[in-house]
Amino acid sequence: MKYDFTSIIDRHGKDAIAVDGLVPGGHGPQPPKEGFDIIPMWVADMNFPTVPTITQAIAQRIQHPFFGYFATSDDYYNAIIHWQEQRNGVTGLTKECIGYENGVLGGVISALNVLCSKGDNVLLHSPTYIGFTGCLTNNGYHIVHSPLVKDEAGIYRMDFADMEKKIVENSIHATVFCSPHNPCGRVWERWELEKAMELFQKHDVMVVCDEIWSDIILEGHKHIPMQSISEDARQRTVALYAPSKTFNLAGLIGSYHIIYNKALRDRVDKESSLSHYNSLNVLSMHALVGAYTQEGSDWVDELRQTITGNVDYACGFIAQHFPGVKVQKPQGTYMLFLDCTEWCEAHGKTIDQVQQAGWDVGVAWQDGRAFHGPCHIRMNLALPLSRVQEAFDRLQKYVFVD
């Protein structure tokens, strides 16, 4: 490979919550037992150095020693338009349809504030991304869950009958849709998106679609933008994207929405700007321009190969060595969602005991209950393969033991 996905780089002391936040009273329990270092497999950021064109773009801008008020450049909009066309096959996108958001979750709330009244019911699938739960609840919206169901092959699917029942019974007119799905890793097929949009059109449900993971699609799968499904979907959907998940730029802040419906776009733009808080950072702008290049695209292709290899290794190891631990092999994202129900029942353990046993040996994974997985654990695989292998060796020796 041209790019570095194998080096183990110490992130301690560099402000990364993935490692520096794991202190008592912070994001983790007690430190691991003596002799075990921390393998960060919880929060969804990556342990790979980002593509060099990003650091080069930022370094070049820093050479100009002025950081005052600025205007968003055409380079920024053109980079997004080109990226969406190259990676997702999007055509007809213009700069007028693109709007800055500090974060995807902030964009979700700006859209819902336009589409709903406080106290309204909003449809979400479960398992559910923890960020949706917090921001919707904190902003006065009531979440109605439609659980995903597993088919005969163990693949999570939407339950369209349940979705329609929940929409009708709860007078729902807005949904927050996750594509690809976090934490389950589903990359929705076109027929699934078409059927969902038919349902939303039938019952006049507006769609806020989080597509932040859309670049991290594993080999053999393809992301389909929700707005590409039909002209109605194009007009009904607020789509949210960011380079942050793709290139590990969460610390720089910077997302964007794509809205084709002018009346809706004007209202969301106004809502997003009311507090004067939602404004682009000049270095984030240059980071996106540096990311959305041909070199950035090449880097993402190698990242996808790396994550696919890590997923293949982890799922194969689980199937061979952890009987009773169930996992649907993700089709996108770099997260695993482990169902430990059968293993815990067979061994007389609680999910708390399993999680603590992992933390004790430095496997810093995440409680799946916050994602509506009652006996689940979420694991980040965006690490060098050697670290993934070390983590699963520890789990075999010290956690999932008879």
Which residues make up each language-model segment?
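N-terminal small-domain helix-loop-helix segment of the aminotransferase-like
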Residues: 2-103, 110, 294, 402
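Conserved core of the PLP fold type I
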Residues: 67-199, 215-216, 221-232
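Hydrophobic residues in well-ordered beta-strands that form the structural core
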Residues: 124, 145, 209, 365-367
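Short strand-turn motif at the edge of the Rossmann-like AdoMet-binding core
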Residues: 211-213, 242-243
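PLP-dependent aminotransferase class I/II
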Residues: 236-320, 326-330
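Conserved PLP-binding catalytic core of the aspartate aminotransferase-like
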Residues: 307-308, 321-360, 377
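PLP-dependent enzyme catalytic core of the Aspartate aminotransferase-like
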Residues: 346-350, 356-366, 370-402
